[in-house]
Structures are given as structure tokens and as C-alpha cells.
Amino acid sequence: MNLGDATTRPPVGRRMKAQAPPPPRPPQPAPRRIFRNAVPDGGGSSGGDCKENMLRSYVDLHISLPTGYQTTINVDGRKALMDLLVDLCSQYHLNPAYHTLELLSPDAQPVSFKPNALLGALDVSCALIKERVLEDRVIRKPPPKVPEKTVRLVVNYHRSQKAVVRVNPLAPLQTLVPVICQKCEFDPAHVLLFKDNINHQQLDLDKSLSDLGIRELYVLDQTLVLQPKMASTPALNYSAESLRSNSLSGSEKKGLLGFLKFNRRKSKGMSVVASGPCVEARPSTLGQSQSVMNISKMSPKVELKKRRAPAPPPAPTQTLPPTSQISLGSPSSHNLLKKRKAPAPPPTPPPSTPEPDISTYVPTATVQEHYIPASVERTPRASTPADDSDLSHSIEDSEPARSICSSSSGDDAAAVGSSSSSLAEEPVTHRADVIAPFTTSTPEPEPKPEYEPELKKEASPRSTPELEPGPRPEVPAAEDLEVEMELKMEETENNRHSGIAWLHSAHESVLERRVQQEVETVSVASSESFADHGYAASEDMAEESGPVSPSERMQSVSPMDIMSLNSDSTLPVKQSKESSSDSDEGCATWGSRQSSGHIQDGQKSIKRQNGYEEDPEITAQIHLTLADLDANLADLNHSDGASVFVDDEIPVSIVDMDIPVTAIDEVLDDDQCSASECESVLLRSTQSISSKPCTPCGVIQNKNNNACLTEEKHRSPFPDIEKQLQTATLTVIDKPTIQSPTSKKPSQDAKITDNMEQKTTFNSEAKSKSETVELTSQKDTVLQKSQSFVRPDVQSVQKERTSSTRVLPTQGKITLSSFSRFGMKTFTVIPPKPAVSQTKPAGSLVTGAIKIDEQGNMVTQRQISSGPEKNNTPSVDTTRADKTPLVKAKAFWSTTEKQEKLTTAKTEPIVNNGDTDVFKASAVTGSFKLSPPEETHKEVIIVERKPISGVASKPSFSENHAEKRDLSFLIPSRRTSSQYVASVIAKNNKNSSIPKTKIDTTPAPLSISGVQNPVNQLLNNEVKPTSIHKPAVTVKPTENPVPSFRPKCLQSYVAEKPTSSERISTLHGGDKTKSLDSQPLSIKIQPFPHVSAHIKSFSEEATSINNFPDTSSARQTPTDTTHPPLAKKPELHKSEIPSEPNQGNVFGPVKKFKPVIFKPVQQETSIHSSLMEAIQSGEGIERLRKVSDLPTSCTVKKPSYNDPENERSALLSAIRASSTSAKLKKTKSVASKELEQLRKVEEDRNVHTEVISPRPTSPDFVPPLPPSFSPPPPPPPPLAPAKPPVVLPPGGNPEAAREALLEAIRSGSGAQQLRKVPVTQTRRQVNGRLGTIQATSPLSYGH
């Protein structure tokens, strides 16, 4: 209640609602059910009772079976008829599924019934059981109706509308017309059926679709087409094709673009006629004065695409009357209908220019603005090219009718077109003259080749209404050529052509003028169809800058080509970065070009360039012009104007042009016949020259989207271009494509081979390639005439830039200058695999040096075995120290092959095969002495990384060792990683560690100087190869390797250096025992306990696997001095303590890097050394031997120090016991703990004695334990506390106590005694398994 109140308290009313009783469920349902049951009966009694009253209780039924048997039975009247059938069938063994029941009334009439009707309710007297007829079902199925075959017929009508009708393909088309017309809402009387809307092939109405084999047709309603067709323009009458069926052809239905294309083709064919009326002189663009409807075959739908009219001219211009007169005088008036009449552009005051004739107004303000600065900055010629593009295009845009005479007839168009082309193509002075017709100024005639008079005549019509028909015949011929060239326009519209045009702008105008006039004539014809060719929708493009007439566009293109040629070489400076050089962009980009003020008409002129090549005369003149340009270019390179050229100002297309032209490994030939290619070469040379002075950063900016060239850094003024070329080229070369023996600056080599493992080797390659590049550049210089010295540089730079894997930081830059985007072609240049010629480094390479070609393949260098190279290796050592293990491995595999060939008799003692076990020590010594320096370098470099000796080694001996040294790569990579750290530590500690470890007799010279004596170097070197090269031999800990590592071998270092070298060689040979026997160890060495312990630990490592070349020489010495006679042990025991500090110094640094070098073995080594030290401290080695020998016996006997075999066996047994004792260690008992306590007490006592007693005795025993296996507890395996045996002190009492304890442990009776032993001294807790020694308080083990 409380909860309910809490929840319902806020809304009190809700609580009342919750308590309201639910609505009663039973009231209505119960009566309804009862009512339903009562209603059918019509009374209070149930229906069953009513029926029962009506039924007869029993019925006498006469039954007739299918077999004819008849009988009479009395049946309960309440049985359903279906049940009756089932009972009868079962009674007479019939299948009710195949039999039916028929009922007959007393009158013998059939009685219809339901299967569930009760027999008593029916008046039945007879029941017939008949077999079911199975065929009745088949009869009942209606016969399948074959559907009428119909197909979907696609009906095209109203140009682009479609309808689908399903019709009978077998019915004749005549019968299908009503259906089609109903669907398309046509009048069947005016309908024509065509196969398609292109060919207008009328179909035979008597044939069916199947006969014709079509499922689609075109329906033409003549009533809809005729009226707009006739009303469009009378000019439509000339096309009989379209009126043949009074229907629009397929080309008509494709809209304005399709129409333009169609007319362009047609106009080309018709323009060839000289004086005949041209159907369409220039179909591509429409006069502004004309509506689209005035064009033939133009449907009203196209009216939406009208060009918006340009602004009305602010003042009347004189150019307009000539155009009107021309149009009046034109023989063909229908041509005018097809051309737009552009309103006269607003007259503008003539720009002030140095030219006398450039009083002509510029049609558009933008053009005028650009035009004025151009003229002011340069000579009339120089100023014109940008202006030319502006003028020509502004004229195109604003006054197509006047300037280009687009509104004139074919003749007028030809004449005026030629004049316009001459206008564009002529130098600025001449173009001003030509432009003058647009203005009041009169053109100044200038002497020109054969075409000039005609051009002047054509130019004059603009200024004067008169037009001479003479030029017309020639114009059609030019047009004919143009038509042919037009077909190839799209192919030749590449960015490089625009660059070529730009190049022409830097050349003299005289030769160009002659070419211009010829080209001008050609361009007149091309003007009619050019713009339309690539740009059918010229209107849309023209909207940006105003109306553009195709002829003007053409004129602006080809004239620019010539104008740029005529213009001074300094003209290119005018070209702005923003101006796009792509002629492919067409009219769409003119707005941006004009905005830059430097429209590059020459770039567009390239569209025509290939067309010019079609004409042999024009081509010949172009080649002559190019020859002169080559001569001029040489001057241009040295001219002051060259400084004006900037990469940014060079047309982007020029660089783009370089992409297809320049091959990575090939030098372009000057033999190229095409003007475009020659021009591209010129452009390239010009570009490289111009960019040199202007790029302070020394970077040539490639507009190819390629990395910038960095050669510019090294470039000097033009006279030195070739030299600069060589240096710059060398600098950029990253990958040697061709290797030729040459020398190169080491600094450049270093740049080139920064990331290469062996810089000297790669430098030689870079040298060779650089020289090759220089040679090729010189070859280019010879070929390229004056321009060649510039061009080879660029090419070589491009080659290297393309092939170089590493790009200098400046190469990542990309110029900000605009570059062509329309039609730009991307070329993926795959450099061929350079033929790598192995060059001998001439002493720069040390044996085993790795040479890597640009393909990443390792090239082996043949070592020169001529004589010992000295003082050359230290630098090489530094380089090698940087080598990665992978590089060293590669060097190994590469050099071993070479070295095998070059191995001399000196290498035989060093041969790694076991066959060379026996050899002369003297010979070995001699070989070591001859080649110790390099060997030490190699071994030290690879292994220790320490500059042990600065002397170069003989290549022959080094080759022998190279094989051994290379074996270091067989070592696991994980250890090689630590070798570098070890090498650093070794370098820091080399002064102390190397000499002290090796020989007591000559420690200072060997260690301090860091340069070992040749013999010692050989020993170290040999040791490393030994450990590296024959790991398998030294791996066996149980065999010779263990004794071989004993510190006694140190004696061998002292007296017999050659013998020690022999030992090393024998180690390589693989028979250490023989070397032991053969070597007389007569020299005494004062071993130091620390040294011996250290040697012991390292010997363990070495025995496990001599995979650690990085270990300092201290470790190597035990490896080298493998088998000293055991008789010298006493001497070792007698070793003076004062020498210990020295050894301690040696041992300390070694320990420092020891863990770093051998991580996996290091732990074992530390464990082993700690255990050994513990054993040594208590002189427990002897006892350990005893225990190992007597696992079952508890007595431990002290073996004599002079018995090496006992020592060896003790160590081996300890090792074995360690593995077996591990199991026992897991289980501990109270007695074992007590035993440990006792041992630790004794151990503590021994620790105190250790400080006082000399350790030299123990070191002797320490080496035998070197195996890297888990620390060997000497006690027998049954001893669970294997640790204690390791700790057992040498004292006799401890031994007896130990034996007693062991017996007690075995019997289990000594536990109490052990507990009773008090711990009075600090003791060490030695864990033999973990190799840890801990000083524990006496209370830790209290019982």
C-alpha cells in the first residue's frame, strides 16, 4: 500500500480509475451464442433435435454393386452418405477412391445429395455403387488455346519520340498502320513508314514484319513536317534529300551539333570550287545578325542556342561598309543566309604603338589593352604576337562578318579570309597594315613572295568595298589543301605544336614572311572549317569572349605561327604564365588568354603546322627557316634577350612537347624532317638556355609536371653550357644507365650515393653514367648545331630525372606557370633496363665491397690481387661499419664467388674445409703477415666494428678471409642487430679489453693503439671467421671445443703468434684436436682469475655457437688458443694477483657488452659465470667432478689439479647433472632447505676466504664449464638441491658435512639435524638453475 500510495499519490484521480472494475465480458457473448444456436432451428429446441425428428431412424436400402450383385440392407438413417459409401466398399472389398455412390428415389429418379447429407433425410430407396471413370478428368480439361503470336514493335516518330505497339509479325504492314497511327495519334492517310530515320528507306506495306526482318520502324507524318520545312527559309530548297520525303533527315534531328558537323563536311567539299557559290563558306559559326532559323536544315528547336548579340559598337566604323559591300557583291546570296553577320565592334582609338600602321582600333577593349603594352614593350613585331592573338580573336569574337568577311560569299570569304590570315600572319607592321582596313588607316604593302599581291588585294576589300576576284581561284586551292589538312588537325593538335609556334616567335621575320604568305593562303581555306572541326559548338565557346568566326580563328592560329616567327626572339617574354599554350582549348580559353594580355596565337598556329608539312613547298621553306632559326638560336643563346626568357614565360606546351619527343635513354636526332620536331628541339634548347640565367635556385622548372631540374645549380653563363652540362648532369644522375669507366668528383659521388651501402662502388657507376651522359650531350651538341649544347643538357637531365630513383629536394617543385590541360597527352616512359657493365673500382673498392646497380641488383666487384693496398681500408672500414647485415650478407655471397677464383696458396691453410687440418704454421703465419691489415679490417668491420688496424690488406689474403668473414651472415640476424651495440661498446673499451685479454707479454701495444700486431690481428680475424665460418665445429660443447676454450690457451698468444694463427686456421679446418697436439704451448701466460672466468663464460658462448663475431678480441683469444697443455695449470694458479686488476678491467668492459651482444646466450653465460664463480670461490669444482663421476655415491673426491681429464669430465658431468637435477629441484623438502642453509653458511665462509685466497686456481677450472647450456650443478642427479653442490666450499669439513647431509637426505633421518644447525653468518643463496646469488640474512632460514 505504501508503494502504491507513493506511486499514485501525485495524481489522485488516477488512483480512482485504477480501482474501477473492468467491463463485464460474459453478458453479450453468451446470449449471442445461444441465440445463434436457436435461430436456425426456429425454436427453443436444438437443431439436432429438429433434424432427428425429421430423419428416419432406419432406411431399407437396395444396394447394387459394380459386379452386378444386388442386396438389400437396413442402414441407420443418421449415417452420412460418404460414410455409407466407405462402409459398403469396405464390406465388399472395394476401393472407395475408385467408386462413386448414386442414389435413386423410389421412383427410380436420381437423387442429388451432398457427401455429408444424412441418409435418413433423403427419400432414397436404392444405392448404386459404380466405378469411377478416370477419363472424365481429361475430357473436362479445355483444349489448349494457342496464343496469337505478337511481337513488340518500336515505332519512332517526331524525330525522337518512341512508342511500343504489340502487333502480329505475320500481318502485312498495311494492316498495322491503323494500330500504329492510333498509338501515335497520326492520320493514316498522311503516314509513311520508313525503315529508319536516317536512310528514309520506305517500307513495302504488303510485307509483314517477319518478311522484312525488322522490329522497329520510323513513322513520318507528312502534315507535320511540310509547313515548318517550307517556312524555315528558301535556302532549304537546295537540299533535295530532305524534301524527297518531306521529312527531316536523321542529321536534322541531331540538333545543332550534328547539323554543324554535316555542313562542315559539305562545305569542305564545296569550298574547293573556285568561283561557284559556296553553299556554306563557313558553316561552323553563325553570323550574329543571323538567327539560327535562317540556317538551312535548322529546326525551330535550335533557336534556343542563339548567340547573344555583342554590345553595339559605340561608334560607326568604316570597316562595316566594306563588309556590306562585299556581301552585296558576293555572287551567292544564300551563303550570306548561312553566315552570321556580326555587328561592327565598337570603334576604339588606335593604340599608341611605335608602328605607323598600328593606328587601327582594337575591336575589344581587352584586346586593345593587351595590344598597347605589347607594342610599347617591344618592336612592332614583338608587340604584335600577343596582340595578334588578341586582335584576331577579338575580331573573331566581335566582328566576324567584317574582319573575316564571314558574311561574304565564298569568294569574299576566301579573299577576306586570306587577308585576315595575312593580317594575322604578317609581322606586326604588316598586320597593322592589314588591320588598317578595319580602321581608317590604309595598309602599307610590304614586299612579299608570290602571294603578297593577292593578300593585299584581299586585305584591301576590308578597307574598300571593291573586291578583286583574282585571289579567289587560288584560295579554293588553298582550301583544298586545307580540307586535307583539316582531316589531320585533331591528330596534330598537340601541346608541343603550340610550343613550336612560340619558338617561331623568337626567329627572324623575313623567312617566316615567305612561309607566312603561303601558309596564309592555306589558312584562308582552313579558316572556313577549322574552328568547326574540333569545336562544333563554337557558339558556346565564343560566348566567353564574344562571337568568333572560324576563319578568324584559323587566321589567328596560322598567322600567329608566322607572326611569332617574324617577331623578335625577345617576344616570348610577353607570354604570361597564365596564357595557356594549348591550341586544343580552342575558343573556350580565349577569355583567359586575353586576360593575360599575351595570347599566344603561335600556339594555335601549330594546329596548322602539320598541315603545312603536307605542302612540300611550305615544308621546304619551313626547314629553311628552321635552319636559319638554328643559326639565330646560337646568337639568341648569347643574346641579352635570352635573359628575359623565364621558364614561367615559356609556353607550357613546349615542355609538354618534350614528353613525347624526348626518350629517356635516347638522344634526339636533328635529322627529324618534321618542322614540329625541329622546332621542339629548338624550343627545348631555348628553354634550357633561357632558364639558366633566370633560375637563381638552379632549378629548371619543368612544365611537364616533372620534377624540377637541379642541374642549374652548377650551370654558368652560356659559353660554359657544355661544361655545366657535364657537371650538372653528373650531379643529377642517380641511376647509372650506362656504365663507362670514368672518374668523377667525389663530392658528386657522395651526393649520388648517399643512401647506397657502398658509396665508392656506386660512385664509380655514377661516374661512368655521368661520363656517358656527357658524351651523349656532346654528341647532341654536334648534332644540334648552335642549339645543341643547350639541348643535350636538358635531355640528359630529363633522362636522369626520369631514371633516378632519388629526387633532389628541389626536384619536387612544380612551376606555377599555366600549362595546357586540353588535349594534353600523358606519356609513361619506361626506361629500359640499363646494361650494367662491371667496372673495376681501381682500388676504391675493398674486397667484398658490394656494388648495387640501379635495378637493385648486387654487382660483384672483382678484387685486384696485384699488391697489398695500405692505408686505404680505414675509410672503407667506416663505410662498412655502416653496412646493414643484409648488405654484408650480399657482400659475402657476391665476393665469395670472386674470391674462390682469386684464392692463392696462402689461403690454403685458412681453407674452411676439414681437409686442411694439418698444415704448416709458418705458411699460415706468412699468409697472415702478408694480409693481416685488410683481414683485420674486414673482420673488425663486420664483427667488432673496431678500427683495429689502419693497414690495408692484400686482396688475395683478404679474399680468403672474405669467405670466412662472409660466414658471419650465416649467423642469425637477431644477433647481428646486437653486434652493432657490441661494436660501439667494444670501440669504447677497445683500449683496455683487446690487449689485456689477448697477451700479457704485449698488452700495451696491442690494446692502446687499437692496432693489433699482424699476428694478433690475424688471430682476431681468424677467430671471427672461425666462430662465424664453422659454427658447426664449435657447436659441440662436449667435445674439443670445451677444452679448447680454456684460459690456458692464453699462453699461445704470448709466445707463438704464428702457432696461434695456425690454431685459428685449424679451427676453420674443423680439427681442433690436431691443432692442439701440433702446437707446442711452451710459453707461460699469467692468467688472471677474472680473465679466466670471463674467458670461461665466453668460451661457453663460443662453444654453443661461434655466431658472435662482434665479441671483442678478449673473447676471441680463448677461441684462438684452443688447446694448451694442462700441465701449465699450476702456472695459472701461480699467476700473480697484481695482474688481476688489469684483467678485472678487461673483464669488466667485456661483461658490459657481453649481455648486449648475446642476449639469448648471455643469460646462460651470466648464470654459468655466477655459478662458476661460486664454485671457484669454494674450490668446489673438484668436488663437482667427483659428484658427477659418482652419482650414486655420496663421497666426493678431490681430483688432482694436474688431471685435465678429471676436470673435463667433472664439467661435463656437472652439465649433465644440471639437466637431470632440474627435475629434482622442483620438489623440495625441509631437509633440503636445511641442507641449503648449511651450504650457504659454508659458502659465506668461503666468500670471506675468496677475497683472501687467490682465484687463479679456480679460473683454470672455469673454462671447462664454458658450454652455454644451463649452468651445470655438479652434484649427482638424485640431489634435489642441486644448488648446494655448486655452492659447496672447498674446505674438508664442509665436504664431510655435505656428505653426511646427503646421506641424511637420502635416508630422511637428517632433517632434524639440519634444522638444528644454527645460522650464524651471512650466507649467499645460490640458485644454480637461475644462476642468481643472493646474500640472505641469517634469520631468513631460522628453524
Curated annotation (Swiss-Prot):
Keyword tRNA processing appears in the UniProt entry: no
Motif KKRRAP 1: where in chain: 305-310
Composition bias, Low complexity: 406-422
Disulfide bonds: none
UniProt KW Magnesium keyword: no
SMART domains referenced in this protein's UniProt entry, alphabetically: WH2
Compositionally biased intervals (Basic and acidic residues): 390-400, 445-460, 746-757, 1128-1137
Classification via InterPro entries: COBL-like, Cordon-bleu_ubiquitin_domain, WH2_dom
Residue ranges occupied by any WH2 domain in the UniProt entry: 1167-1187, 1207-1227, 1297-1317
Keyword tags: Actin-binding, Cell membrane, Cell projection, Cytoplasm, Cytoskeleton, Membrane, Repeat
Known partners and oligomeric status: Interacts with pacsin1.
Protein name: Protein cordon-bleu
Source organism per UniProt: Danio rerio
